[in-house]
UniProtKB/Swiss-Prot annotation:
UniProt cross-references to HAMAP family, sorted A to Z: Ribosomal_uL29
Record carries keyword Disulfide bond: no
Species assigned in the record: Cereibacter sphaeroides (strain ATCC 17025 / ATH 2.4.3) (Rhodobacter sphaeroides)
Entry similarity comment: Belongs to the universal ribosomal protein uL29 family.
Molecular-function GO terms, alphabetical: structural constituent of ribosome
The protein's name in its UniProt record: Large ribosomal subunit protein uL29
Pfam families: Ribosomal_L29
Gene Ontology BP term (one): translation
SUPFAM superfamilies, per the entry: Ribosomal protein L29 (L29p)
Keywords (A to Z) from UniProt: Ribonucleoprotein, Ribosomal protein
GO-annotated cellular components: cytosolic large ribosomal subunit
Amino acid sequence: MNAQELRSKTPDQLRDQLVALKKEAFNLRFQQATGQLENTARMRAVRRDVARIKTVLNEMAASAAAN
């Protein structure tokens, strides 16, 4: 998922996706703690996706406030 794809979505869609990613991150942390996590790179990818979504949401909020 890249920033261009995210910018084409509505804020509600982004918030829904953010909730889903946070749930996934929670589950990945549990898997890591119990030694069941095989793909540790997924944790990094999820964390960065969350950051991308938050960045795009903040950009949208800033542009809405400026108008």
